[in-house]
């Protein structure tokens, strides 16, 4: 038993996994789309889902169950009597009898069904007020199975109380998911938030609203009145189709419809609401609905048995209902109510399409549910930009994006967007994780590029770390950490400066001692190496000299080359008698024997050693080695001198390292003032400017003959604006392609109405009266009769985007110049100029990806950007082309369904239709090849009936600009500028440093002039960190200046040229818990005022401001630093005591 238990456990686990797999197949999702701002009295939210087929034998036992936390209305849960009307082949037909209208028969019986969409009066109307939800289902059946469609309607307030729950129908489970979209109160259509407002079409011109096609779901409600024909709904249909003479249709009731995913109830018919009239007309044209089948049955077949009649209820003596009997894929609803009876008679007809043609008088039915589409006017909700901020979390960052109206688009190349949403009032919030902080975090949100500077996050973590290290002295821990945690070389310079100041008297002698020890060892090694080298050189010289005077140094016996004369003399004496000249041991007097002995002899260097001993020994205590050994690194004079020099050097490095690198665009830190240009010749500027960038150029133009005469010159070029004259082509639609085979045994093809004939776009081909047996199934014998009808149609139309065609294009920039007191502005087109008596500014050309006749497709809000189509069909469109299905104000434009039908036959098999044309819609093709289309960005769009203006942030769009300022200026007149500018710093927020930056609020007063174009800078005493160009008007002006830079002691002031406000304000430290991203578009500014760079005097100003800032900020930091300095001097004195005086030690 013990051995078999693991096997049993394994089998049990496998069984559980298989059970979960089976359950997963029975789980269906019902999505309820809700706006994220929900108030009182905003109607109902509705959703539906189609379930897998259920055997017809189980239908009578179906019951809709709920585990949801909302209150379900019980009116639809009760049993209701239905007449089950079915058909079958007669059993008494002889074999091989040719099929005819008499070959089939129908049967009627009474059954009880529960949970169908039989909604009593006032249930939907009071659902919102009573906080009750309605759940029901409808059936589409053939002879063997039924396709349930479950509907859920509830007060829109359930979006706040429910996130998900389960419904059950038979063995199927329905996961109800309430999904709150980014729409404030509208519905999500075409990726935009659309608010249907049906009265706009009656009261406003057509260019002020949009028209969008939206799904509508309608439910039949029975309401019987005692007198009059006001509730006889069939009368309205007959009047609409101009049918007269029908008097027997006394059913009373109305349809209650819900538009889109959420709306107020719409009553059909209603005389004073054109929406009701539109739905009524569509019901008359497509009595079974405009959605013909489920998407899984897009390619399917059905066999039509023919027209049949029957009894409803089954106790009737004559037939009261008629329809078309079929088998195969179910199409429309199989439930309805007779129009002829005053009291409702409900019919369930599996395998029969009940009569719904309102142009006949008798035996008609109305469906219990109807689904279609309706074009509605309305307005698109305005979108707002996102705010994105991040906090450091582990190795990455936790980020959050929120918008006041909703987030329709968010993506990031460096972060994982997990779509975890929160809603706070009208705001939508999305949290996500960024795994890397070694690079700046880029987030695209609501069409705007946001950049979060991660070094600011790292600074915050650094401050937290140092604050923890210095937590023993909490009074200064945070202030000291703020000074230490500065990014880049500037931060390291700060650390070295503080270390030198506090611990220099200990570190300087310690580090000097270590360096001296290393240098002494190196000097000794070098000197020793040099001694050995000199000795070898000396030996070589002696040997060469001996060879010149005495001859060869080679022994004649052993052939060994000697190095000294004594060694050669020993060889001559010993080798001839067979003795070793070194160790004097006996050996053979042959060269080979003696040389072999020399290899093992240990005294071969005896003569060289004797020579070395005879020379003078090396004295390592001379020269460099002795100087290093006797260096007095513990001298107070040396330590103090080095300490002072290091402090001065590090202060200079600290001040110089605060400058940022020069950039081609963006702000470059400069000193106060602006550049001066002597006008010895014309001033000419020629450059290329990206479409997303603005350009500011400011100089003082100096008279070369009189340096005191200067004219202020300011040039401002704004961002490029694209002006397109457009033609609104309408809304591009997506659709499901359907291919249907309808086969019946007898009669002509015109005898029956096929489902595609009520579709908006369809093609049909009939194969009539077959002459052979090869195309007839065995249960449909006969030759020369019957029909195979092939149909292709489009349904489930869905609006996917707006389409505009470019008629003409203009690229403009607003150019303003201020020369002295004269100001001129003009919106300049391409190949156009702004010309004054002294200045000429021209846009020579534009590089662009747009061309007239291009088509622009927007798949969402304009701010999301769009796609450029070079080829877009407008007249003859084929299915699958861009623009194949278009919804226009004049109606639906259907494409040509090009292709040919072929009927596939096999003996004793029902024929099947085939279509060799394209079966994929143009939209689906576009999605599959979306990357092959050019995209474009849209910022600050403005749209009207025939014009669209926007700014494209793509740097590939550029303007070639040429500026010429003539040297022939009237310096005497223009140099005298009476304009007086006074500045006051009002407020500041943000942080100093090169992180997120700060915002300085300036109050600027202009006198003596009516208007003055100039730039206001954000500076401290030494240099400036940001600027904005503004057109001042007489009086008080509030200006916001954004800057980046500075240090803890910076008091930011508002400055104009060299004049600044009298007081400055200190920004916060760059260690915010949440670092907010900035718009990349806001930083695409090129500013050039020619101001001088920060020099030596600027550095020392910055130093003084920093020191004063530290003293004013937290004087305890300075006190602690001085205490540490005194401590280090004491330790120095203790470890390095002063040497006694020489005179004191050597008194006579």
Swiss-Prot record:
Changing residue 536 to K: In strain: isolate Sotkamo 2009/WHO Arbovirus collection. Residues 767-787 are annotated as: Fusion loop. Keywords: Disulfide bond, Fusion of virus membrane with host endosomal membrane, Fusion of virus membrane with host membrane, Glycoprotein, Host endoplasmic reticulum, Host Golgi apparatus, Host membrane, Host mitochondrion, Host-virus interaction, Inhibition of host innate immune response by virus, Inhibition of host RLR pathway by virus, Inhibition of host TRAFs by virus, Membrane, Metal-binding, Phosphoprotein, Repeat, Signal, Transmembrane, Transmembrane helix, Viral attachment to host cell, Viral immunoevasion, Viral penetration into host cytoplasm, Virion, Virus entry into host cell, Zinc, Zinc-finger. Disulfide bonds join 34-159, 68-165, 117-136, 141-146, 183-193, 218-257, 386-445, 390-399, 415-434, 462-485, 745-780, 749-787, 761-894, 775-905, 790-913, 816-825, 833-842, 873-877, 979-1009, 1002-1054, 1019-1024, 1055-1060, 1094-1098. Changing residue 25 to R: In strain: isolate Sotkamo 2009/WHO Arbovirus collection. InterPro entries: Envelope_glycoprot_Hantavirus (IPR016402), Gc_C_bunya (IPR048791), Gn-B_hanta (IPR048790), Hanta_Gc_N (IPR002532), Hanta_Gn-H (IPR002534), ITAM_motif_hantavir-typ (IPR012316). One of its GO terms (biological process) is symbiont-mediated suppression of host TRAF-mediated signal transduction. A motif (YxxL) lies at residues 625-628. GO terms for cellular component: host cell endoplasmic reticulum membrane; host cell Golgi membrane; host cell mitochondrion; host cell surface; membrane; virion membrane. The record marks 658-659 as: Cleavage. Residues 24-496, 659-1115 are lumenal. Residues 621-644 form the ITAM domain. Residues 1-23 form the signal peptide. Residues 518-637, 1137-1148 are cytoplasmic. Pfam families: Hanta_Gc_C, Hanta_Gc_N, Hanta_Gn-B, Hanta_Gn-H, ITAM_Cys-rich. Residues 526-543, 598-615, 621-635, 1131-1148 are annotated as: Binding to the ribonucleoprotein. The chain crosses the membrane at residues 497-517, 638-658, 1116-1136. GO terms for molecular function: RNA binding; zinc ion binding. Glycans are attached at residues 142, 357, 409, 937. A zinc finger (CCHC-type) spans 555-575, 580-601. Belongs to the hantavirus envelope glycoprotein family. This is Envelopment polyprotein. It comes from Puumala virus (strain Sotkamo/V-2969/81). The gene is GP.
